Regions:
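Cleavable N-terminal signal peptides of Sec/SRP-targeted secreted and luminal proteins
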Residues: 3-19
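Glycan-processing catalytic domains of CAZymes
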Residues: 21-308
């Protein structure tokens, strides 16, 4: 069935390589997991969030010329009250409706699909503020994922994306947010929050990218805090989402990228055909794995469902 592939579009999933899931996923290790990135950033007027259109369209006019996704999902399995009308129409004249990430029913449906089709869990992504009300929205999505993971025996992990972040406040913003999630939302107390190497797992995505504002000193400060600098209940095993040239980037990013516990290079869009994939395997994947082995680091490759 195509719908799990379509979850990739509903949440812009990037699927991390691993193996078959079980009815209740082992939440003590990342090893052997088939995990997806869950961005949860689709908003619709009337979804309960109090916001307008976000990410489905690049304006508040929900027409095809403003559509902001590459592939359009099949919503056949959604209930009528989960969908929100646009100003677009299908060829038969019926109104095109889309889903929001805000209602709990959305995450419950996605996590049920993940259980049905043997996906172990998700990286629930957290971005800096996108608009007024964004923090409340993204908190609701995270709590929805927590509830859905607990219901369907999946796992979830917080993934911070530094895209667009303010470098001067990023360390305080991220560490304060993590402490809030641990203390107020009790995310790491959930039996479905994924642990690895005896600690909760956290990912920070965006190290070593030339178009991200984060500097090496702030990146290293964040890594050190999660690994050993924070009070014990906030410490975590940290996975770094790094640029594809992490191994050859040179100083000062080379030492930063090598200081995380798990290295996960960004593959998305790096090749577009079989020949390109073969070249990537030879020139990146194999030497990346060898480098990680020599460093005593773990390695998590990424695949994606296919879009421009």
């Amino acid at each position: 069935m195509a719908h799990i592939a379509l979850v990739a579009i509903l949440a812009l999933l990037t699927i991390c390589i691993a193996i078959r899931a079980q009815d209740t996923v082992n939440a003590t290790t990342l090893t052997g997991k088939y995990m997806c990135g869950y961005q949860g950033w689709f908003e619709c007027p009337g979804d309960g969030s109090g916001g307008g259109w976000f990410h489905w369209f690049n304006s508040q006019n929900p027409v095809h010329s403003s559509l902001n996704v590459d592939l359009f999902p099949d919503f056949a399995e959604y209930a009528a009250n989960e969908l929100f009308a646009t100003n677009m129409h299908y060829s038969d004249g019926s109104v095109v409706k889309v889903n929001s990430s805000y209602p709990l029913t959305t995450e419950m449906r996605h996590f049920k699909w993940m259980k049905d089709y043997n996906i172990d869990g998700v990286w629930v992504q957290r971005f800096g503020p996108k608009h007024v009300g964004w923090n409340d929205f993204t908190n609701k999505v995270l709590l929805n994922c927590k509830t859905a993971a607990e219901t369907y025996g999946r796992v979830f992990v917080v993934m911070y994306d530094v895209s667009g972040a303010n470098n001067s406040t990023l360390f305080n913003d991220m560490t304060s947010d993590w402490m809030y999630l641990v203390d107020t939302f009790k995310v790491t107390s959930s039996p479905r929050y994924l642990k690895h190497k005896g600690k909760p797992l956290v990912s920070v995505w965006g190290f070593g990218f030339p178009d991200r504002s984060i500097t090496t000193d702030v990146a290293q400060q964040i890594i050190n805090w999660f690994k050993t600098g924070a009070p014990a209940k906030y410490q975590a095993t940290i996975m770094g989402g790094v640029n594809d040239d992490w191994r050859t980037i040179g100083p000062p990013w080379d030492s930063v990228c090598r200081s995380v516990d798990i290295i996960s290079p960004w593959f998305v869009g790096r090749f577009g055909d079989i020949a390109g994939a073969d070249s990537w395997k030879t020139n990146n994947l194999i030497p990346d794995v060898a480098e990680c082995k020599s460093l005593g680091k773990e390695y998590l490759p990424v695949i994606w469902p296919g879009f421009s």
